[in-house]
């Protein structure tokens, strides 16, 4: 079955067309600058090279139409007609407490996603716009929603509750939800395939470290704790997000500088993290280069960033009563060799031992980077959220036939 996977953001639509018969990516690309006069479609050609098609001013419906047109284009397309698309799978950022797994998208489900707008005001409306656009252009084609939050719905209350007055949970849904769930689910399953072990017997810590980052404790195949919270701002220090911070520091700044909630939101989401500390960049490659050139603030940011990851791994190992496997994924986790080494060295007391040579030469490939003598396997696994979405979509739609 050919599955079109869509990730609709506020100003972009990313896509992959995946043939689930053999797990091959037939086409990929994305529309950027939706709603602006210089919108464009970036797509990959069959030889691997990239091309751009100017679109001008388009909305989400126009963006989805542009994606479908490029897929069926007589010269650069890979399918003859829309009818070859068996189903469409959507990344949906927030499913609240309603969704613990991927679901067929119906009017009722769509309304429940809309009910979560307050929890993900930037992402969920864009996700819904994409779903509605597909419904208009491809009526009758089944659509499936795959939620970033779903994998973490197995967390026990002691992990997801905040110690706020209980009424804020009951009335407003304030609790830890966690994100990157599709990635954490994919790499926790994939690492067990690579190692030839049973996920139901393993204690795994998955580290999704990119511009946004989160860590998850996966006990016997289920998420039991994760570093992101009600929003993706909690947890690790990130490219531009603050991560864990004393809430008292935020109320102090609000009062002192007369900040509005929106202004504070912008600071903790867009102006903090690595960018905030270095005042240089949110890109870890640039920060590593600046550190090598002797920039003290870049050095400090790296130390803070790495220490936070180490702390979470240590905490989750304690929570699960040990750890068998540590996984690194995401743009930074897959490629920043120095960071992986610095994160893992303090974990030697837990039996974590890297093969330094293998670690330094592994970038973006599935590789066991721990030494043979290590009590804990450390593995790099490139994430593939789109493949997970495609498989879920295929499984759900196949059962309808």
Regions found by a protein language model. Give the residues of each.
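Short beta-strand-loop/turn "lid" adjacent to the catalytic site in phosphate-handling enzymes
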Residues: 71, 75-123, 144, 150-159
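Phosphate/pyrophosphate-binding loops at sites that engage ATP/ADP/AMP, CoA/4′-phosphopantetheine
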Residues: 70-85, 191-198, 313-324
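Glycine-rich phosphate-binding loop of actin/hexokinase-like ATP-binding domains
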Residues: 151-255
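Glycine-rich beta-strand-to-loop/alpha-helix junction loops that act as flexible
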Residues: 9, 90-93, 209, 323, ...
